[in-house]
Amino acid sequence: MAPTAKTNKGDTKTAAAKPAEKKAAPAAAAAKGKVEKPKAEAAKPAAAAAKNVKKASEAAKDVKAAAAAAKPAAAKPAAAKPAAASKDAGKKAPAAAAPKKDAKAAAAPAPAKAAPAKKAASTPAAAPPAKKAAPAKAAAPAAAAPAPAAAAPAVAKPAPKPKAKAAPAPSKVVKKNVLRGKGQKKKKVSLRFTIDCTNIAEDSIMDVADFEKYIKARLKVNGKVNNLGNNVTFERSKLKLIVSSDVHFSKAYLKYLTKKYLKKNSLRDWIRVVANEKDSYELRYFRISSNDDEDDDAE
């Protein structure tokens, strides 16, 4: 009976190992399926990290944290294997209960192994984004470099040099053109005209005082009548009228006024105004008597 019992114990060990392997196989397959899915999922963050260069630093930090967590998780399954072997050696007596416990113990390390496999798979999948992020970062400064290079010439424009002031030219003394009649002293005018009324006044045909009054009333100075002031003065010496003036007026103007006076008194037909000198006039009769003598001689 003893040998048969030994053979039964060996069969129980092999029988217990087979269900454990069968259970471990689907667990490993499930672990592989789970590992492959994270790889596919990890590829998406890799593409997102390549597009968003700014998030590369955060992805690198996550990778480091995952690697640090994977190391203690891998150490735990390694310690769990010897513990499971010692339990199998100590539990040889109960044949029916041992296979169930061994199957559970074998199934427990299988998920534990799958967990590090997932983490290990996530670390290499996440690592490429970090590598891709590095060239992306390098490309970003390279792209940004031309902008400062282009801006550099604008900043480095040379300041305009102050133009040297030209030496002041020697100032020329310019003589102002003085217009004629401005700023010059006017020469004093002194006019003296005489009108000789001796021949007419002796015959009591004409009054010299009345003639003087008429000339004063009609004579214009600066275009105005009764504007003589101290500029024009009148004198009578015997039967002559003397007109003195500091204002310029023509000799003919005085002759014009004398003729008007003779015409007013109806003396213009017998008396005429004759210039005997440069500045004087004389009143004379027309030669009527000479014509009468000629008529008498003809008879």
Curated annotation (Swiss-Prot):
Top-level taxon: Eukaryota
Keyword tags: Ribonucleoprotein, Ribosomal protein
Which GO molecular function annotations are given, in alphabetical order? RNA binding; structural constituent of ribosome
Name a biological process GO annotation. Answer: cytoplasmic translation
Report what the protein is called.
Large ribosomal subunit protein eL22
Give the gene that encodes this protein: RpL22
One cellular component term from this protein's GO annotations in UniProt: cytosolic large ribosomal subunit
Pfam families, per database record: Ribosomal_L22e
Ribonucleoprotein keyword on record: yes
Record-stated family: Belongs to the eukaryotic ribosomal protein eL22 family.
